[in-house]
Regions:
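Glycine-rich, Lys/Arg-enriched anion-binding loops that position phosphate/diphosphate groups
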Residues: 140-239
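Residue-level signal for inorganic ion chemistry
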Residues: 26, 79, 117, 177, ...
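N-terminal Rossmann-like or analogous alpha/beta NTP/dinucleotide-binding catalytic cores
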Residues: 58-121, 125-143
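Phosphate/ribose-recognition catalytic cores of enzymes acting on nucleotide-derived substrates
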Residues: 194-306
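N-terminal catalytic cores of NTP/NDP-binding nucleotidyl/phosphoryl-transfer enzymes
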Residues: 8-71
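General small-molecule cofactor/ligand-binding pocket signal
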Residues: 2-4, 87-89, 146-150
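Extreme N-terminal starter segment of soluble prokaryotic enzymes
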Residues: 1-3, 14-15
């Protein structure tokens, strides 16, 4: 996949494209992208995606802070796996936000040689997103762009969308979110120094500082997770929360106890992959009660992952 981020880049070879933010690059996105590739193969054209590094709403509403399923870097890595030919990573500016659907289509045709647009069945674009697929078809006839309305994708009766997946993660339903994503949800970051309380009670933890400040953090609680450090995979139990038994502070921490592990990984990059929600975070009357519960959590995690 060749990434093009310059709006003045030379035109592509004749291509079929679709437009979207593609947050999380979930199964619904992949279904749409596969339709782009099918049309391109049938017509002897190249396949392309039109997307943006920032969420468009951040430009239109500057106080908006998205809860992303994938950071900009992660999104490109996921899109790479779709094996499309080109990714047009266009900077979403105020000027771009004011273009009508017809003007944006004209830009794609004249600047990038897009011959066919495959539009998601419920997707709208252009200033205020006020126009319909029928309008796009009319503009397509004027601009010599063939329009295709993509087939909808569902999982049984469930509609798959980034907003649905976000809500599942906010509720701790990481297993169902993984079904919709097509992979386990993950957080990338760096291991940072903590208070080392876990070590004192027999459960040393690695504290994760997430790379992308806009990345969605799942609901507080305890999870069975996979941990990736320097290309190696480990099982772990993760706590997201305030550690109420040993801490009265308000800061949310992301701490993982890695099973059968004793290496020093401070300041190293780490990926946490969510597999199963175990329980909510709770406050215990004594440290001994907390330790007893953590032993139960570790046994349950081992049964799930090992």
């Amino acid at each position: 996949m060749k990434i093009i981020s310059d709006i003045n880049h030379q035109a592509l070879p004749p291509s079929v494209a679709t437009i979207g933010f593609f947050d999380g690059v979930h199964r619904g996105h992949r279904f749409l992208i596969n339709q782009v590739k099918e049309v391109a193969d049938k017509d002897g054209l190249y396949s392309a995606l039109v997307t943006f590094p920032m969420h468009p709403r951040q430009v239109i509403q500057t106080t908006y802070h998205p809860q992303l399923l994938s950071s900009p870097k992660e999104k490109l890595e996921l899109l790479e796996t779709t094996q499309v030919d080109y990714c047009l990573l266009l900077p979403f500016t105020q000027e771009l936000s004011l273009l009508s659907a017809r003007e944006f289509m004209q830009l794609l045709r004249n600047k990038f040689n897009i011959h066919t647009l495959v539009i998601g069945y419920d997707h709208r674009f252009g200033h205020n997103r006020s126009e319909s697929f029928e309008d796009y078809c009319r503009y397509g006839e004027e601009l010599n762009i063939y329009m295709v309305r993509a087939r909808a994708y569902t999982d049984g009766e469930d509609k798959i969308s980034s907003s649905v997946i976000r809500q599942l993660l906010k509720e701790g339903k990481v297993s169902q979110a993984a079904q919709f994503l097509g992979y386990n949800y993950y957080l990338d970051g760096t291991v940072v120094d903590g208070y080392k309380v876990g070590r004192k009670i027999g459960f040393p933890t690695a504290n994760l500082q997430v790379d992308c400040s806009d990345k969605l953090i799942p609901s507080e609680g305890v999870y069975a997770v996979y941990v990736y450090v320097e290309g190696k995979k480990w099982a772990g139990m993760l706590n997201i929360g305030h550690r109420p038994t040993i801490n009265n502070g308000n800061n949310v921490s992301i701490e993982v106890n890695i099973l059968n592990f004793s290496e020093d990984i401070y300041h190293k990059e780490m990926r946490i992959e969510f597999v199963k929600y175990l329980r909510p975070e709770e406050k215990y009357g004594t440290i001994d009660e907390l330790i007893a519960q953590m032993h139960k959590d570790r046994e349950k995690t081992a049964k799930i992952l090992l």
